């Protein structure tokens, strides 16, 4: 990356790979109204992009050649002046993943430590000479005299890291093996990005440019996201046991300027001193990852100076009842990201106040239903006798597992489904010791189950050395802060409180015009979706499953679905006491079996595996028509355990989220609690899954346009065994369905609210004698039930079919399938790009011959209009200003809150409840009608006879 300073009209230009970005201070908008000027109080900067010309030959631009620039941190405003922050010194310290080529390790990606950062003013050239002529004396002046000196000193302290090709803000299990800027922007964890505030406006600007220019911007490699903490890779070259171990510690910014303060929780559940530490081990064939987190105790307390030896003591400011809300919010956030959370409290009570804190912590944890383990040993005792710690944490370590990826097969065969949340007070050493010992134990347990890799002495030495260095850097960071807390709080306030607005009228206009022309490059189309669920009882069958995958309505090639989503339960028999509870062979077997069917001999349509993942015995597979694959993006998954209170993989859910062009889909397969009487447990499983499954940027299940939720829900029929079997023979399915537990739960609005299930006209799918069509004849004589279900939600979905396959007999369940038609919105990216180019060319024709100020004035004119496209009307751009004009507040009296007798949305004396003059013993609601009562349907009556 190169940097130029514009001298005639002060500007900063960065250039890389034939692409330039120019930043220039905007004092006022030419032609703006007084109201716009009054509202535009946020300091503004104009940004322009253009192809790289030979700036060095232009006398207006001076290239800064005193150092090598490595990336853009963003824009910062201090005391009304704006500066461009760029990285000017780095060191390569890590490569989490690599390949062995010709017996040599070749890094697949790199992590860099930031050594120096420079700040270039958009206001004047006062400090330019210090930046253009490097010397120790000038560096000292930049630290002590430059307005951004404290920020420069902060970013240059050796604790900031970034990567161009590795999503450094997320743990390995949360990102794929492929990497690009689009992925990073969409999926990064902003709580660990220290320059998120500085780069936010550049990211917003990027969202407005065309896809073609986005690619140029990405290739230039300007945008850089930095984390703070510690990162390093150690390579152990030992023949077949060649391996690398990478440690990545990320200090959270969730508390902003109080990030490193010694204090408790905030009302919204944020804590200080929160650090996520991940170990990544890479071998020639496998990648392992394990994550732990530590932070301040999530309660309301403050530290006060003590006259005793220990220096500080704790004062609890709120009891467990008052603190419970914030405590719950903190752990809800952790659960949504990491899965099951187990507390490891390592504070040894030394006083009455610490004893009170420990009791309050215990009360809140028990109220929330979170396991808490108290470790009262010192760091030296733990180091000498690690078994004392590991014995107490053994169950959690086994149950949470570790992330594991088979490089040669290209499959994930284990996932970490929980995390240890370590709590400490005024200490970095003890949490680091606990994490080091747990990390070592996890690696030993994991590698014991992998035949091709063993832990060697050099590897374990490297592991311990990395943890020692991790402690040194984190302790150094914390100690520096505590020694001068007030100073650092001011620096963090500048970093997180800076506000700058980027102004680019050209791209704003193009973006707005494209929105108005949306109908010219978007269209709606129908795609077909096959959804199938099957509990296979741990079998690896040789039986043909063609009747399930290709029902009669899809038996011909031109009738095949565009998307196949397959959910399987009990694909493996789980063995307790294993770190890696997923058998990769089973997943490969089913992927190959189904893909072979879809791509049968003579078929012109070709299908590919779009995505798959497994949680214990639950497997979710997605296959898509190859011609539609290019329209799918932003694929990501999540898992949630519910078995044994969330501590085992025998029950739970696997979910995937993806966008088909502009329509967002979510597919889930789940296995809920078994047993006739366990309705409440199944309901709790549903609530846990619905609450815990989250995707990037906090996206939840309900936030999607179309949702398909299927699996072995284990709901039973509340009738006697004899009555159920008799009604099955006479095909009285409607009568059975009335007593179905899931049906009753949905009618009551308890489980799966807003979901729809098509009328069932097939016999119960559980439980059979395997290999026969006979319902259970064993000693238990289980009551037949519709345990296997498929539900849907979303206006874009229309269900066409809901059946089971009665002739696939190898399991004690029967496979169930549903066929949907989905109305999706498709964006023709090529046509959109063409239109964007046309708009750009027409605007540039109007601006030809004008200088920069005149161009901004023209584009800021409300009357600016460009000619029509393809017969459409002329298009006028909306009024633009760096800050949007807020709508005036209108005083409006709100109605009183609702009660049992009156609802605020029902007026004029109308009753809250409506009594229908229908005899429920004779009539029932017509199941063929749309579940939404406001959808008109003249063909079907509202009620029908039973």
From Swiss-Prot:
Compositional bias annotation for Acidic residues: 936-946
Family: Belongs to the synaptojanin family. In the central section; belongs to the inositol 1,4,5-trisphosphate 5-phosphatase family.
SUPFAM superfamilies to which the protein is assigned, alphabetical: DNase I-like
PANTHER family linked: INOSITOL 5-PHOSPHATASE (PTHR11200), PHOSPHATIDYLINOSITOL 4,5-BISPHOSPHATE 5-PHOSPHATASE INP51 (PTHR11200:SF269)
Protein name (record): Phosphatidylinositol 4,5-bisphosphate 5-phosphatase INP51
Pfam entry (one): Syja_N
InterPro entries recorded: Endo/exonu/phosph_ase_sf, IP5, IPPc, SAC_dom
Other remarks on this protein: Present with 98 molecules/cell in log phase SD medium.
Its biological purpose: Controls the cellular levels and subcellular distribution of phosphatidylinositol 4,5-bisphosphate (PtdIns(4,5)P2). Does not utilize phosphatidylinositol 3,5-bisphosphate (PtdIns(3,5)P2), nor phosphatidylinositol 3-phosphate (PtdIns(3)P) and phosphatidylinositol 4-phosphate (PtdIns(4)P). Plays an essential role in a TGN (trans Golgi network)-to-early endosome pathway. Involved in endocytosis and acts as a negative regulator of the Slm pathway which modulates polarized actin assembly and growth.
Source species of the chain: Saccharomyces cerevisiae (strain ATCC 204508 / S288c) (Baker's yeast)
Catalyzed reactions: a 1,2-diacyl-sn-glycero-3-phospho-(1D-myo-inositol-4,5-bisphosphate) + H2O = a 1,2-diacyl-sn-glycero-3-phospho-(1D-myo-inositol 4-phosphate) + phosphate
Regulation of protein activity: IRS4 and TAX4 are both positive regulator of INP51 activity and phosphatidylinositol 4,5-bisphosphate turnover.
One GO CC term, this protein: actin cortical patch
């Amino acid at each position: 990356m190169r940097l130029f300073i514009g001298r005639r009209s002060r500007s900063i230009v960065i250039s890389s790979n034939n692409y330039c970005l120019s930043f220039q201070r905007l004092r006022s908008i030419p032609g703006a109204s007084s109201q716009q000027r009054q509202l535009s109080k946020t300091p503004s900067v104009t940004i322009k992009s253009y192809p790289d010309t030979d700036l060095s030959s232009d006398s207006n631009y001076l290239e800064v050649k005193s150092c090598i620039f490595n990336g853009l941190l963003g824009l910062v405003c201090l005391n009304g002046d704006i500066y461009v922050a760029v990285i000017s010194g780095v060191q390569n310290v890590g490569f989490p993943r690599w390949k062995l080529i010709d017996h040599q390790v070749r890094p697949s990606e790199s992590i860099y430590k930031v050594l120096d950062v420079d700040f270039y003013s958009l206001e004047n050239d006062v400090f330019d000479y210090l930046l253009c002529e490097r010397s120790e004396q000038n560096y000292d002046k930049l630290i002590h005299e430059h307005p951004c000196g404290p920020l420069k000193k902060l970013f240059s302290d050796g604790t900031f890291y970034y990567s161009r090709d590795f999503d450094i803000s997320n743990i390995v299990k949360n990102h794929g093996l492929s990497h690009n800027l689009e992925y990073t922007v969409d999926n990064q964890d902003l709580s660990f990005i220290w320059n998120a505030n500085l780069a936010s406006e550049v990211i917003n600007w990027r969202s407005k440019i065309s896809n073609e220019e986005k690619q140029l911007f990405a290739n230039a490699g300007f945008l850089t996201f930095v984390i703070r903490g510690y990162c390093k890779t150690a390579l152990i070259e030992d023949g077949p046991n060649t391996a690398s171990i990478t440690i990545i510690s990320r200090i959270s910014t969730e508390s902003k300027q109080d990030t490193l303060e010694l204090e408790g929780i905030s009302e919204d559940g944020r804590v200080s001193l929160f650090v996520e530490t991940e170990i990544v081990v890479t071998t020639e064939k496998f990648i392992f990852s394990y994550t732990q987190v530590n932070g301040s105790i999530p309660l309301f307390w403050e530290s006060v100076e003590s006259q005793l030896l220990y220096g500080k003591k704790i004062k609890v400011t709120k009891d467990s009842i008052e603190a419970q809300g914030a405590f719950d919010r903190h752990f809800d956030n952790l659960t949504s990201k990491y899965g099951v959370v187990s507390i490891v409290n390592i504070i040894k009570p030394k006083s009455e106040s610490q004893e009170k804190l420990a009791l309050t912590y215990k009360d809140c944890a028990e109220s929330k239903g979170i396991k808490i383990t108290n470790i009262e040993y010192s760091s030296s005792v733990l180091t000498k006798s690690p078994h004392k710690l590991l014995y107490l944490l053994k169950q959690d370590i086994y149950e949470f597992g570790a992330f594991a990826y088979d490089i040669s097969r290209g499959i994930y065969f284990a996932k970490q489904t929980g995390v240890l949340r370590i709590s400490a007070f005024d200490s970095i050493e003890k949490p680091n010791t606990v994490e080091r010992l747990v990390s070592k134990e996890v690696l030993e347990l994991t590698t014991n189950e992998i035949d091709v890799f063993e832990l060697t002495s050099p590897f374990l030495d490297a592991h311990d050395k990395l943890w020692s260095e991790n402690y040194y850097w984190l302790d150094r960071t914390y100690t520096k802060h505590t020694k001068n807390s007030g100073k650092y709080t001011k620096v963090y306030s500048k970093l997180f409180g800076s506000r700058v607005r980027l102004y680019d009228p050209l791209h704003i206009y193009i973006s707005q015009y494209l929105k108005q022309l949306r109908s010219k490059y978007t269209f709606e189309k129908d795609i077909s979706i096959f959804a199938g669920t099957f509990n296979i009882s741990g079998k690896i069958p040789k039986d043909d499953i063609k009747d399930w995958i290709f029902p009669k309505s899809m038996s011909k090639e031109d009738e095949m679905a565009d998307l196949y989503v397959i959910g399987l339960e009990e694909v493996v028999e789980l063995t307790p006491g294993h770190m890696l509870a997923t058998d990769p062979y089973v997943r490969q077997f089913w992927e190959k079996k189904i893909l072979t069917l879809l791509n049968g001999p003579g078929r012109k349509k070709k299908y590919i595996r779009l995505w798959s993942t497994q949680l214990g015995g639950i497997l979710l597979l997605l296959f898509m028509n190859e011609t539609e694959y290019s329209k799918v993006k932003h694929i990501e998954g999540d898992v949630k355990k519910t078995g044994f209170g969330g501590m085992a993989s025998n029950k739970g859910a696997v979910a995937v989220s993806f966008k088909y062009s502009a329509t967002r889909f979510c597919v889930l397969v789940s296995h809920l609690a078994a047993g006739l009487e366990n309705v409440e447990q199944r309901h709790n499983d549903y609530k846990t899954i619905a609450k815990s499954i989250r995707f990037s940027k906090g996206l939840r299940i309900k936030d999607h346009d179309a949702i398909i939720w299927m699996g072995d829900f284990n709901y039973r029929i509340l009738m006697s065994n004899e009555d159920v079997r008799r009604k099955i023979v006479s095909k009285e399915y409607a009568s059975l369905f009335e007593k179905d537990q899931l049906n009753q739960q949905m009618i009551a609005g308890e489980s799966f609210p807003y979901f729809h299930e098509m009328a069932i006209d097939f016999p119960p799918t559980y439980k059979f004698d395997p290999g026969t069509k006979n319902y259970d004849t064993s000693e238990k004589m289980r009551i037949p039930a519709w345990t296997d279900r498929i539900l849907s939600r979303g206006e874009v979905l229309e269900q066409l079919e809901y059946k089971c396959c009665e002739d696939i007999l190898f399991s004690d369940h029967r496979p169930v399938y549903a066929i949907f038609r989905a109305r999706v919105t498709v964006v023709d990216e090529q046509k959109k790009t063409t239109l964007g180019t046309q708009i750009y060319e027409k605007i540039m024709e109007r601006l030809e011959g004008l200088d920069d100020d005149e161009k901004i004035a023209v584009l800021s004119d409300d009357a600016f209009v460009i000619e029509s496209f393809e017969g459409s009307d002329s298009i006028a751009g909306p009024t633009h200003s760096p800050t949007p004009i807020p709508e005036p507040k209108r005083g409006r009296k709100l109605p009183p809150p609702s009660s049992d007798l009156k609802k605020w949305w029902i007026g004029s004396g109308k009753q809250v409840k409506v009594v229908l003059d229908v005899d429920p013993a004779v009539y029932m609601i017509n199941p063929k009608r749309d579940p939404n009562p406001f959808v008109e349907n003249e063909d079907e009556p509202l009620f029908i006879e039973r």
